[in-house]
């Protein structure tokens, strides 16, 4: 069948209206190619009278009325499979790493249905991260979905990098990293970090363990809206080959924001706080595809920017519903100099259940949270009356809570260059043993500074000797 041609009748920024013969209009989500240009347009609406409204996936500079456009008859397709490993691609699957073309022999559409209900396979297996606070109070599930929530500058990307460092390097499977509307510098840093650690094999790209898809801050909204789907399509193809895949998204909020921009450009009526009326549906369509089947698993770790530190904002609130574990980063904890700045009282996990993690882990985690909660309640009294007015048992709770708070900090491998402290990976068994000793009162004689920025409890005892 011959490809149908149309012509541009209107350009408003990233929105381009194209007129086709009335009986051969493109379908919604069809990809249109501009003649004599690499620009791709994606159909978003059919306006009637043969006119379709499209979003430009690239710069619309130089477009004018009357230019000819060809309908490809298919949605956007991107390369998938082994050819993507070790490569950096844009939203359309074009290489942006100056290492030659990507093999297009295996491609897939970025728009596809989520797996059927009977194909799904929930997992109870824990994924150890080596980060104490996460392993203790909000453990991750293999094949689960994790969100890192935080405002500006509290450490989402650093935490994401450490998780990649601890999990992706030890993980024998493959990883896919989707950079959605974040800083180009961070994407560049990530690539070099992966190359230095051997996850990207520069000598033989096919031996690499990670595929990267970037649609950064400076890209048009159409690119930022679709780049998460491009990354997900690559991850799905690896999963359908029977592999266990790690899928990192930094930042899922920018996906929502790009949707808001596109929605406004298309002339839709905004809903709460100016977001698109289709926010829940767009988020659901993406998140329902990030799932594990009986063939293979996708474990997804997503950074979620929280506008103005407001967790009730519609964008983070919509994301919450889809996650198995939520890691909430707090500005108050970061202000105390405790990194990672994870709030152990706000962070939750579906896995923190005695039938999944075991009775000992569950009890220790709940005792730690109980001690910290009691300290939080006592802080107002301490601020007004001072420590001396507290009952002896409350003084003990405060002392233990401050030790727990400091013991929840940990030096990161990816931050070694800034802190000068070597990074620490703490096994889950050591994490449980350490916190169990603190809540049982076995460390009451140690000064609280001995617990700051150490790995295991044994290191805290060593540090206490030096402090003394």
From Swiss-Prot:
GO cellular component, one term: proton-transporting ATP synthase complex
Record Gene3D superfamilies: 2.40.10.170, Bovine Mitochondrial F1-atpase, Atp Synthase Beta Chain, Chain D, domain 3, P-loop containing nucleotide triphosphate hydrolases
Main localization (coarse): membrane
CDD domains tied to this protein: ATP-synt_F1_beta_C, ATP-synt_F1_beta_N, F1-ATPase_beta_CD
InterPro entries associated with the record: AAA+_ATPase, ATP-synt_VA_C, ATP_synth_F1_bsu, ATPase_a/bsu_AS, ATPase_alpha/beta_chains, ATPase_F1/V1/A1_a/bsu_N, ATPase_F1/V1/A1_a/bsu_N_sf, ATPase_F1/V1/A1_a/bsu_nucl-bd
Protein EC: 7.1.2.2
Keyword Nucleotide-binding: yes
Entry-linked PROSITE patterns: ATPASE_ALPHA_BETA (PS00152)
Binding annotation for ATP: 150-157
Catalytic activity: ATP + H2O + 4 H(+)(in) = ADP + phosphate + 5 H(+)(out)
Domain of life: Bacteria
Statement: the UniProt record of this protein carries the keyword Membrane: yes
Keyword terms, alphabetized: ATP synthesis, ATP-binding, Cell inner membrane, Cell membrane, CF(1), Hydrogen ion transport, Ion transport, Membrane, Nucleotide-binding, Translocase, Transport
Record localization: Cell inner membrane
Family: Belongs to the ATPase alpha/beta chains family.
Function (record text): Produces ATP from ADP in the presence of a proton gradient across the membrane. The catalytic sites are hosted primarily by the beta subunits.
Protein's name in the database: ATP synthase subunit beta
Species the sequence originates in: Acidovorax sp. (strain JS42)
Gene giving rise to this polypeptide: atpD
């Amino acid at each position: 069948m011959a490809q149908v041609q149309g012509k541009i009748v209107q350009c408003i920024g990233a929105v381009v209206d194209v007129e086709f013969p009335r009986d051969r209009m493109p379908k919604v989500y069809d990809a249109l190619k501009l003649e004599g240009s690499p620009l791709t347009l994606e159909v978003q609406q059919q306006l009637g009278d043969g006119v379709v409204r499209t979003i430009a996936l690239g710069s619309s500079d130089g477009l004018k009325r009357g230019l000819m456009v060809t309908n490809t008859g298919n949605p956007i397709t991107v390369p998938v499979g082994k050819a993507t490993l070790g490569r950096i691609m844009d939203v359309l699957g074009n290489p942006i790493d100056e290492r030659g073309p990507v093999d297009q022999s295996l491609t897939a559409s970025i728009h596809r249905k989520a797996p059927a209900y009977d194909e799904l396979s929930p997992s109870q297996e824990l994924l150890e991260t080596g980060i104490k606070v996460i392993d203790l109070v909000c453990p991750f599930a293999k094949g689960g979905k994790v969100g890192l929530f935080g405002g500006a500058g509290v450490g989402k990307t650093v935490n994401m990098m450490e998780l990649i460092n601890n999990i992706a390097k030890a993980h024998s499977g493959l990883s896919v990293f989707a950079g959605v509307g974040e800083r180009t510098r961070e994407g560049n840093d990530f690539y070099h970090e992966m190359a230095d650690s051997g996850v990207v094999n520069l000598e033989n790209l096919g031996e690499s363990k990670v595929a990267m898809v970037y649609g950064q801050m400076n890209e048009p909204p159409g690119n930022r809206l679709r780049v998460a789907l491009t990354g997900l399509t690559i991850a799905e193809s690896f999963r359908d080959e029977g592999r266990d895949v790690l899928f990192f998204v930094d930042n899922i909020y920018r996906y929502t924001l790009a949707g808001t921009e596109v929605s406004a450009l298309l002339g839709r009526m905004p809903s709460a706080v100016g977001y698109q009326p289709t926010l829940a549906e767009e988020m659901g369509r993406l998140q329902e595809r990030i799932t594990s089947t009986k063939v293979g698993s996708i474990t997804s770790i997503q950074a979620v920017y929280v506008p103005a530190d407001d967790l009730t904002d519609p964008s983070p609130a919509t994301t919450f519903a889809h996650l198995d574990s939520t890691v909430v980063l707090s500005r108050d904890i970061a202000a105390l100099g405790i990194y990672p700045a994870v709030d152990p009282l706000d962070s939750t996990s579906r896995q923190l259940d005695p039938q999944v993690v075991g009775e000992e882990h569950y009890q220790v985690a709940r005792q730690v949270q109980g001690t910290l909660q009691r300290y939080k309640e006592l802080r107002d009294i301490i601020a007004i009356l001072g420590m001396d007015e507290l009952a002896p048992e409350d003084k003990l709770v405060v002392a233990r809570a401050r030790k727990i708070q400091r013991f929840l900090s940990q030096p990161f491998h990816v931050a070694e260059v800034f802190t000068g402290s070597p990074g620490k990976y703490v096994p889950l068994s050591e994490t449980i043993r350490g916190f169990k000793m603190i809540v049982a009162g076995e460390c009451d004689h140690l000064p609280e500074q001995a617990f700051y920025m150490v790995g295991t409890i044994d290191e805290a005892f060593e540090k206490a000797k030096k402090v003394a």
